[in-house]
């Protein structure tokens, strides 16, 4: 399999041999030596030297490579020169001139626009072995310059390449490898550029001596780095499933199977996007986070507002980095919470049109990407999402008020973690009736409060033991009296009603209540409702 470095050499050579004298390479700053090494290989193919310059060097640098890249001053001074490209082209030097940083202010610099255009035509007319490569970490070429300045992208290494790097590093540092260690390290390093992987591995081997702790070091580095760019790698939730969501479970199981190699053999592919929509506090975010665990992929959470930078260039660099990260992370879930907030004013030119450009980039990626990534977004208000965005979601699930059977499952999950209890069927009926209309989040909070109260009681009485405390129904009922469910508050209930009125646009996360706690559908004036021939349940 061809490495990214070999591909860069081949792509640039193709441009050079097709008489394209001017090009750009988009690469991470940390990968400079890798880019120069690839161009040195390309230069050897066509027998031309490589030169490099950025504003930190007074003179143009001659590039050579033996064991590593080395730079040496030439006689050509470029610092403090307004038009460095024209200065280069006025010399007698021949070769490949790699200029870094010139495109940083490209969008707002009319003189630079003209200089690049002039450089293209000068190179084209002279018919000499001279090439200019403009290097930047985020390149956005305007339409008029697009045919003059083709862009080659030097992307992070593939998982196969990272595996080879990891194995070589473990061997060099005299550590034995095993499949689990290799898998965890590759997962933690995925999405990083070559140069950054090398730095992280060097730091890891110098600071961590215990093999089992090595993946954690790499992952901690990655988390800290991404945090400043609006990206997080959340820890796995402390529960295995979201209760009472049988229909959503079926969808997630389908998606899991569509990520299997057998699906590709049949020409099937996983969905590109799933939308979880509905009432606040119903478990949308938790369901999205658990989906990564269910599918067996990496969870990458993004905060849209934090992706917006101080400039269009910074903002586009952030979203490009995010999409490159998930595309190179193997099986992955890209998670956006409260996604509708990202599109407030997106088409109105707010913030210089940056929101529109970012949204356009995401829309294009959702449509075109072929990597094993599913985007899962949660929203409260469907009407705040643009129609062209809604169309990109292949599955839309609605989270509404949960029925008695689902509420019973929610209680079971939280009670089993915190208490010993033995409720009779009648006691369960009483509990579910008291908490009817509460969201899963409100149930979880109530159980947590009761667990805290029992802990405080036992500590103060001197009767504390590490065993789970015995729970009585009356304590949970008393806790219910201390709060008003959101669904009962006028302002919030109106918002919930508005959300539920649009629920027909999506598939509910739970099907009909088939539990023993299902509420009997009471007939009107003795006339059964249509479809009421289903099994009669015990009334709550």
What feature does the model see in each segment?
Residues 1-20, 47-50, 60-61, 220-228:
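A short, basic N-terminal segment
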Residues 189-215, 433-489:
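AAA+ ATPase "lid" subdomain C-terminal helix
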Residues 22-30, 39-142, 146-151, 161-166, ...:
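Walker A/P-loop NTP-binding motif of AAA+ ATPase domains
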Residues 170:
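Conserved phosphate-handling catalytic cores of large alpha/beta enzymes
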Residues 2, 6-15, 229-290, 324-328, ...:
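C-terminal engagement/docking regions of AAA+ P-loop ATPases
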Residues 210-241, 340:
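Conserved ASCE P-loop NTPase core motifs with emphasis on AAA+ ATPases
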Residues 165, 175-192, 424-427, 431:
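Amphipathic alpha-helical segments of the small helical/lid subdomains adjacent to P-loop NTPase cores
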């Amino acid at each position: 399999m061809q490495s990214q470095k070999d591909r860069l050499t081949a792509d640039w050579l193709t441009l050079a041999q097709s008489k394209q004298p001017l090009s750009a390479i988009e690469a991470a700053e940390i990968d400079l030596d890798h880019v120069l090494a690839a161009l040195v290989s390309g230069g050897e193919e066509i027998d031309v030297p490589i030169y490099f310059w950025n504003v930190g060097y007074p003179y143009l640098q001659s590039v050579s490579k033996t064991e590593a890249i080395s730079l040496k001053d030439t006689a050509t001074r470029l610092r403090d020169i307004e038009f460095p490209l024209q200065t280069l082209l006025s010399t007698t030097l021949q070769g490949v001139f790699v200029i870094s940083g010139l495109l940083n202010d490209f969008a707002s610099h009319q003189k630079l626009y003209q200089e690049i255009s002039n450089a293209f035509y000068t190179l084209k007319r002279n018919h000499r072995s001279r090439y200019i490569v403009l290097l930047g970490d985020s390149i956005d070429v305007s339409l008029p310059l697009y045919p003059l300045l083709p862009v080659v992208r030097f992307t992070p290494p593939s998982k196969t390449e990272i595996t080879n790097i990891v194995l070589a590093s473990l061997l060099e540092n005299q550590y034995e490898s095993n499949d689990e260690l290799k898998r965890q390290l590759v997962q933690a390093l995925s999405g990083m550029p070559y140069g950054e992987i090398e730095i992280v591995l060097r730091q890891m081997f110098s600071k961590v001596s215990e093999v089992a702790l090595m993946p954690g070091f790499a992952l901690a580095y990655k988390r800290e780095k991404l945090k400043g760019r609006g990206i997080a790698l959340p820890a796995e939730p402390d529960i295995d499933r979201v209760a009472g969501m049988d229909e959503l479970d079926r969808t997630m199981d389908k998606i899991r199977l569509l990520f299997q190699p057998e699906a590709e053999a049949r020409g099937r592919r996983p969905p590109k996007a799933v939308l979880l929509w509905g009432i606040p506090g119903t478990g949308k975010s938790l369901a999205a986070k658990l989906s990564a665990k269910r599918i067996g992929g990496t969870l990458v959470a993004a905060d849209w507002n934090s992706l917006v930078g101080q400039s269009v260039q910074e903002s586009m660099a952030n979203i490009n980095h995010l999409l490159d990260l998930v595309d190179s992370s193997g099986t992955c879930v890209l998670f956006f919470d409260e996604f509708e907030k990202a599109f407030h004013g997106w088409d109105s030119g707010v913030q210089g049109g940056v929101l529109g450009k970012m949204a356009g980039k995401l829309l294009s990626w959702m449509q075109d990407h072929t990597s094993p990534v599913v985007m899962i977004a949660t929203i409260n208000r469907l009407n705040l999402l643009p129609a062209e965005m809604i169309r990109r979601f292949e599955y839309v699930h609605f989270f509404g008020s949960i029925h008695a059977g689902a509420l019973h499952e929610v209680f079971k999950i939280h009670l089993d973690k915190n208490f010993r209890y033995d409720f009779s069927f009648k006691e369960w009926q009483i509990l579910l009736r008291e908490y009817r209309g509460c969201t899963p989040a409100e149930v979880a909070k109530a159980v947590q409060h009761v667990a805290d109260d029992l802990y405080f009681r036992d500590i103060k009485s001197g009767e504390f033991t590490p065993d789970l405390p015995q729970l009585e129904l009356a304590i949970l009922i008393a806790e219910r009296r201390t709060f008003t469910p959101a669904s009962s508050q006028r302002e919030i209930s109106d918002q919930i009603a508005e959300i539920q009125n649009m629920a027909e646009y999506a598939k509910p996360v739970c099907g009909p209540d088939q539990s023993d706690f299902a509420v009997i559908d009471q007939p009107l004036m003795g006339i059964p409702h249509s479809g009421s021939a289903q099994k009669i349940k015990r009334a709550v």
